A protein has these predicted regions:
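Active-site entrance/lid segments in N-terminal catalytic domains of soluble metabolic enzymes
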Residues: 1-210, 216, 246
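Alpha/beta catalytic cores of nucleotide-metabolism and tRNA/nucleoside-modifying enzymes
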Residues: 2, 55, 69-83, 145, ...
Length: 330
């Protein structure tokens, strides 16, 4: 088991997590997950490409993303990037999609990874592929010696399925909401508060079923401000995987822009390159100080203040706080 100072995980998105920002997050008491299908494993030096993505007009960005990500993944770069993070003395975490897990996981494990993330729009216990051998998640996790975090799950049944397959953590949501066009392109979106509550209920039932095995519930998406981050934990999440908030950091490789894996799909892009701007350093976004009351910095300070305001001293008890649904009055 790995313990971190704060309930935050850096999302495996090229605009958020590079080897250097993963190292910086580790030194700040959390973990950044590197996208092992991203630009850092396709190009020896992706910085010129990152700069061009940030400079393009929104209407031109998607076509360029498709072009940039058409470059093949290079296993030797997977090894090099993970070694770079490990040499810095922080926790090493990498992510693959279900479609490519079978193809590259041995490279990842041989390179040395502490946490392995399988992240997709929707993940089941057996991923079916026409191009590769199907991924039997239960057998895959059983054969590994590292904790596996899997998602996304959006309801009780899907989450329970992943827990029974052996996942150490379940990602709730489809991630990348600030950059997502899922609602417009395929008509799918997730009410995150309900989804987190449902998955937390699945976790409680699974604990009874398994004799006490605790699975981490990790909210993934719809947390662009600290208030949403706090609400996710109150609904039952143990941690949050943050994308857009960390993409606003001065150190972020997206240079004030943000995009997810859906934006680079070769035939049906379901995401956008969004302008998120820059609000401060990683230190300021996570720990403050804040200089604006807009929820973009000092996420941990906001969590501590909310817990104190509600009379709770730790996240476990905060997860049981009463929650009332009201109309949005903002």
């Amino acid at each position: 088991a790995y313990e971190f100072d704060i309930p935050v995980i850096g999302a495996p998105m090229d605009s958020v997590t590079s080897p250097q920002t993963a190292i910086a997050m580790g030194k700040l008491g959390t973990v950044g997950v590197l996208d092992l299908e991203g630009l850092w494993t396709r190009y020896e030096n992706p910085e010129p490409i990152l700069e061009k993505i940030a400079s393009l007009d929104p209407d031109d960005a998607t076509a360029y993303l498709q072009q940039a990500y058409a470059e093949p993944i290079k296993p030797e770069l997977i090894v090099e990037r993970l070694h770079e993070i490990r040499d810095a003395g922080v926790t090493v975490a990498g992510a693959l999609s279900p479609q490519r897990t079978q193809q590259y996981y041995s490279t990842v494990l041989n390179a040395g990874v502490d946490l392995f993330v399988i992240r997709g729009t929707s993940v089941s216990a057996e991923h079916v592929s026409k191009d590769h051998e199907p991924l039997n998640l239960k057998q895959f996790i059983y054969d590994l010696d590292v904790p596996v975090i899997v998602g996304g799950a959006a309801n009780y049944r899907a989450a329970l399925h992943l827990m029974r397959a052996g996942a150490a953590g379940v990602l709730v949501g489809f991630g990348g909401v600030a950059t997502s066009a899922n609602r417009q392109t395929i008509g799918v979106s997730i009410p995150m508060a309900t989804a987190i509550s449902d998955v937390a209920e699945a976790r409680r039932d699974y604990m009874d079923e398994s004799g006490g095995r605790y699975v981490q519930v990790i909210a993934d998406g719809s947390m662009g401000e600290s208030g949403s981050f706090v609400t996710a934990l109150a609904m039952g999440a143990d941690a949050a995987m943050l994308g857009a908030p960390l993409a606003r950091a001065q150190e972020a490789p997206g240079h004030g822009t943000h995009w997810g894996s859906e934006a680079r799909h070769a035939t049906l892009p379901r995401g956008l390159r969004s302008e998120v701007g820059t609000v401060g350093t990683l230190q300021e976004i996570l720990y403050g100080p804040s200089h604006k009351a807009d929820g973009t910095t000092n996420f941990i300070g906001a969590l501590r203040r909310a817990m104190a305001s509600c009379g709770y001293v730790d996240i476990k008890s905060f997860q049981r706080c009463p929650v009332v649904v009201t109309a949005n009055r903002s």
